Each structure stands twice: as C-alpha cells, then as structure tokens.
C-alpha cells in the first residue's frame, strides 16, 4: 500500500533534517575521550591504603568539557571543567583512601563521567584492597 503524498513529504523532510544535523551531532558526541589507571591496582598492607588514579582527557578539537569522577561506592564528586585551545590531552589525577578494621577488603573502581557536551563515560580503573594486621 503506497503512502499518502502528505506522509511521503513529511518522511522526506524528517530524513533530510536528520541527515543535515547528523554530522554536527556525531562530531560533538565524540570530541572527548578519557582513561584512568589505578596504582596500585592491588593493594595489600596496613590500612588505610591510598590508591592513586591517573590518566588524561583527550580532545579532538578545541572546546570545553565538563566531567566528574564516579566511584563504585556512589560517592559524589564535583563537576570539573577543562578548556582546550586546540586538540590534545590534559592530565588528570585523584586519590581514594580506604580500608579499616570494619572494611578490611574492598574491590572497586573509579571512572570519568562526561557531563557536557557529551554524556558517555570512560572505562573504569579497577582496584582492590586487602588490609593486613599491623605488627606489634
């Protein structure tokens, strides 16, 4: 059954609009990427222990990006802003100190959550902590 002329016309208008804006939307969605690594990825020792996370945000063109760290325990972090005058990368770092007699073992992660202009996230930087008893 053929479509009515008015339906065909609106279908073509919608398709043309989508094709017109698709390059701008895809370029904006992929301007930034991030990665983090945990050091040490596996901690065993006297607690509390500190895990250091380092990495970078990479831009494919000039622009502003807003992001925050997200953690496996759900603790919030403030939104941060980086300005890129040109394509390139900027270093990132944060720490997480944890482990106690009430939490002697923990497996977790931290990732970068982009807030603006895109909303994707990095792969998580995984780690684990195993507290040992302090020698007397």
Language-model segments: what does each one mean?
Residues 1, 17, 84-87:
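A signal for specific C-terminal beta-sheet/loop modules enriched in small/flexible residues
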């Amino acid at each position: 059954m053929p479509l009515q002329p008015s339906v065909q016309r609106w279908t073509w208008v919608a398709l043309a609009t989508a094709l017109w804006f698709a390059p701008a939307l895809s370029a904006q969605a992929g301007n930034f990427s991030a990665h983090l690594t945990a050091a040490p990825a596996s901690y065993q020792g006297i607690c509390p222990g500190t895990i250091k996370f380092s990495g970078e945000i990479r831009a494919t063109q000039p622009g502003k990006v807003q992001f925050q760290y997200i953690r496996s325990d759900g603790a919030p972090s403030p939104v941060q802003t980086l300005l890129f005058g040109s394509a390139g990368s900027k270093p990132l770092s944060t720490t997480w100190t944890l482990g106690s007699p009430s939490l002697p073992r923990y497996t977790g992660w931290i990732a970068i959550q982009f807030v603006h202009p895109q909303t994707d996230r990095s792969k998580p930087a995984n780690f684990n902590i195993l507290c040992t008893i302090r020698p007397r």
